[in-house]
Amino acid sequence: MDGRCIFSSIDLKTMEFYKVVPKDLDGIVSQLRITKGVECAIFLYQTKTLEYKVSLRSNGKVDVAAIASYFGGGGHVRAAGCTMQGTVHDCVNNLSEQIEKQLIKAE
């Protein structure tokens, strides 16, 4: 995706160690999105074993609502979210496939 998409994640063990709650994570995905050259940002945090809450942000070239909807979530073109099952790598790979399709379509 040529650096047009950025992702970050935090696992449950790290959240527990630092006493982080989901509210503490508000805004991280938006900060990722403003990285120069990034058109789509993904932030995942683990809620239980093999389950992640996913936040997606876009500059508009990627319809993150469509991506979230594909995975059972919802939102708006520029801001959306969903819950996914699997490892963080599985989640990112599955999201990346959908983002890549949209980036190709937008060109």
Where do the language-model regions lie?
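Hydrophobic helix-and-loop "lid/oligomerization" segment in the mid-to-C-terminal part
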Residues: M1-Y70, G75-E107
